[in-house]
Regions:
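Phosphate-binding glycine-rich loops and their immediate beta-loop-alpha structural context
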Residues: 128-193, 362, 366, 375-379
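Hydrophobic alpha-helical positions that pack around
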Residues: 130, 140-142, 161-163, 184-290, ...
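Short, conserved beta-turn/loop elements at beta-strand boundaries and strand-helix junctions
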Residues: 82-88, 300
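Short, well-structured beta-strand-loop connectors
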Residues: 50-64, 80-82
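N-terminal, Lys/Arg-enriched amphipathic/low-complexity engagement segments
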Residues: 1-49
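Active-site gating/interface segments in enzymes
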Residues: 218-219, 223-229, 260-262, 298-349
């Protein structure tokens, strides 16, 4: 997982974990409630289509607002227990829908009727929130016609093995999903990007197989596309604008399974690590409360423990376990309070460790000075802010314990908002 040369001074190297063939996946105990986040703010309750007590069928599209098309898909049957506003990281506003699960609820027949015809419209109407995180906007070809489809069967962070499990044990679903994606996008070229240690035995999948380095962060989209396509995407440019769609392998598998079974497949593979580092793989519906998943493993959260969704390098810290497993929640990591590394308040000592380890060759020591001062435009124009691949290595090696990665995420988010507002008002 971690190596440093003993013969010369060089940056440490981190390696993705390889899934062992014996790794089992367990079904978590069924939760009696579900939490769903709709990507639309709850500003006016009088515009709601739904209310507390409404019955919900399994697989039903829930469209909360009269004047917005945003929707979620119910992973289980039951009734709406509450509808409330929720503020996520960086102040993003969502609508939270709490469901009370009922064992004898009905299944919705809407997708079963639509699944007879594979089309982009069907995918966009039903597959938002699919496990793995399918970006229906990116694959729609709205930016540019999709010429190349890259199915990423690589891990998003250290300690996670969810993608490898899906590739190895849901291969038939992956194959079906690739066929569906090829049909709806019209892509002429389909590539399956896999870790170098797992490339064997993938020849029967309907795609070109390309191996990706097992040195972190080779799986980040920018670095991965350079390795498998031999071309670079300009900094700050979405792959879709270059005619490239990147789809996580779990999303491809869920897509294939959905059309095969004629139901929206909402089962998510999650890697869970407890305070001792013990690793478990679970299959749970999207929307399962994190608290319920941890309880099924007898993991207790104490004061000042850290709960991370997404992995140790790029994950986000959750302030509560009353939070759902989301489509992109590949990993849940629980850290004991005594093992938590706290951010420091010291200024940069200009040691250069962050510059040496940066895979994108960003002058991080200069960049962080402008980010701390809130000079985001200068950071983007003069110090390659958008060249950053969001790997978190700079924060990991910083002796001053500066939360560099968090500064970078905040800057990118703020600049994206401001530039979108400028374009809208132009």
């Amino acid at each position: 997982m971690f190596r440093r040369s003993v013969f010369r001074h060089s940056p440490p190297r981190f390696f993705y974990q390889t899934l062992t063939t014996e790794a089992p996946v367990a079904l978590a105990a069924s939760s009696r409630r579900m939490i769903l986040f709709c990507d639309h703010p709850l500003e006016h309750t009088d515009r709601l289509r739904i209310k507390t007590g409404d019955a919900v069928a399994a697989g039903q599209r829930i469209v909360p607002f009269m004047d917005a098309s945003a929707y979620v898909v119910a992973p289980a049957a039951g009734s709406i227990r509450a509808v409330s506003a929720f503020v996520g990281d960086f102040g993003r506003n969502w609508t939270r829908i709490d469901l009370a699960v009922e064992d004898r609820g009905e299944a919705d027949a809407g997708f079963a009727a639509a699944a007879g015809q594979v089309s982009m419209e069907t995918v966009r109407r039903w597959m938002n929130g699919l496990p793995g995180g399918l970006d229906t906007e990116a694959i729609s070809g709205a930016e540019a016609p999709i010429e190349t489809l890259v199915v990423a069967a690589t891990e998003s962070d250290l300690f996670t093995v969810s993608a490898q499990y899906v590739l190895r044990h849901r291969t038939q679903n992956v194959r079906r999903g690739i066929d569906v994606l090829r049909e709806i996008t019209g892509a002429q070229r389909v590539i399956l990007a896999v870790g170098r240690d797992t490339v064997q035995g993938m020849g029967h999948v309907h795609a070109e197989i390309r191996a990706v380095s097992n040195v972190y962060p080779a799986s980040s989209h920018g670095l991965m596309l350079r390795e498998v396509l031999g071309r670079e995407i300009p900094p700050g440019t979405a792959p879709a604008k270059a005619g490239i769609a990147v789809v996580p392998v779990e999303a491809a598998a869920a897509l294939g399974r959905s059309f095969a079974e004629k139901r929206v497949a909402m089962e998510k593979i999650v890697t869970v690590l407890d305070k001792t580092g013990r690793q478990s793989l679970f299959e749970v519906p999207v929307g399962t409360p994190v608290a319920d998943l941890l309880a099924s493993l007898d993991i207790r959260l104490d004061s000042s423990d850290r709960l991370i969704a997404g992995g140790p390098m790029t994950g986000i810290c959750l302030y509560t376990d009353d939070y759902p497993v989301r489509p992109d929640t590949h990993c849940l990591l629980v850290q004991d309070a005594a093992a938590v590394g706290r951010a420091g308040s010291d200024p940069c000592i200009n040691c250069g460790e962050c510059v040496r380890i940066c895979p994108a060759r960003v002058p991080v020591n200069m960049l962080v000075r402008f980010l701390e001062a809130g000079k985001y435009e200068t950071a983007a124009e003069e110090y390659d802010l958008f060249s950053c691949v969001d790997c978190g290595l700079c924060t990991c090696v910083c002796p001053a314990r500066i939360p560099i990665f968090q500064y970078i995420r905040l800057a990118k988010y703020e600049l994206t908002l401001s530039r979108a507002a400028e374009a809208e008002n132009a």
